[in-house]
């Protein structure tokens, strides 16, 4: 999965897909009442990027629905969306409410109330383990609204670079048993060791681990891309998807990896 980083403006959806992304990451900021408000990152952000691009959340989600509905030219090119949920602005007790409001919003504006809505898989990426009730609030709301089937399209990620054991315990508290992606990384302005990514991959590949897929961010340089592929990740989050495509076509990688398609289930652990 080639995950376009910080796609917060409607025009950027096309831009990143055209460069080779089959997945995008979008920042979601919340208002004081825990409603998803903007797709916005703000400063500081990755080196070489405009941190201030934004849309109203509803407008972005409607455009995303159009792009990921059969008949659209992007439909079979873009099939995974990571919502990077900026919950640090919320009180801990608001996490469940944020999940409820996010679910209602996506149900209406993305899934079109279950009537021929967008088809992409969605990952809810949460920066704080304490906010695990966002997941339970989200799930319960879709069930209450009569659309539990949409949870087949939803996965989860804790993005705070916490200890993998603590992440696993938090999923147990939330009652999550699958659809788990694990991120690791740091802004492209800095370097980070592969210690934790290796631990995440080990959990993914172990018999009793909870992780299904592992991705690393933000990977922009060619050598870092090679190092990341050598760590056996499932996804690379990048500001330059065309560089990821280029490296995947190198002799060392083109027989070992392929770019995911719509037919690939992002919740299944890949077994060699």
From Swiss-Prot:
Cofactor(s) needed for function: Mg(2+)
The record's free-text note on cofactor binding: Binds 1 Mg(2+) ion per subunit.
Keywords: Cytolysis, Dermonecrotic toxin, Disulfide bond, Hemolysis, Lipid degradation, Lipid metabolism, Lyase, Magnesium, Metal-binding, Secreted, Toxin
Disulfide bond annotation, renumbered to this chain: 45-51, 47-189
The keyword Secreted appears for this protein: yes
Transmembrane segments: none
Biological process annotations from GO: killing of cells of another organism; lipid catabolic process
InterPro entries recorded: PLC-like_Pdiesterase_TIM-brl
Tissue: Expressed by the venom gland.
EC number: 4.6.1.-
Cellular component aspect of the GO annotation: extracellular region
Active-site residues from the entry: 5, 41 (nucleophile)
CDD domains: GDPD_like_SMaseD_PLD (cd08576)
Function of the molecule: Dermonecrotic toxins cleave the phosphodiester linkage between the phosphate and headgroup of certain phospholipids (sphingolipid and lysolipid substrates), forming an alcohol (often choline) and a cyclic phosphate. This toxin acts on sphingomyelin (SM). It may also act on ceramide phosphoethanolamine (CPE), lysophosphatidylcholine (LPC) and lysophosphatidylethanolamine (LPE), but not on lysophosphatidylserine (LPS), and lysophosphatidylglycerol (LPG). It acts by transphosphatidylation, releasing exclusively cyclic phosphate products as second products.
Entry's family note: Belongs to the arthropod phospholipase D family. Class II subfamily.
Protein name: Dermonecrotic toxin LvSicTox-alphaIC1biii
Provenance organism: Loxosceles variegata (Recluse spider)
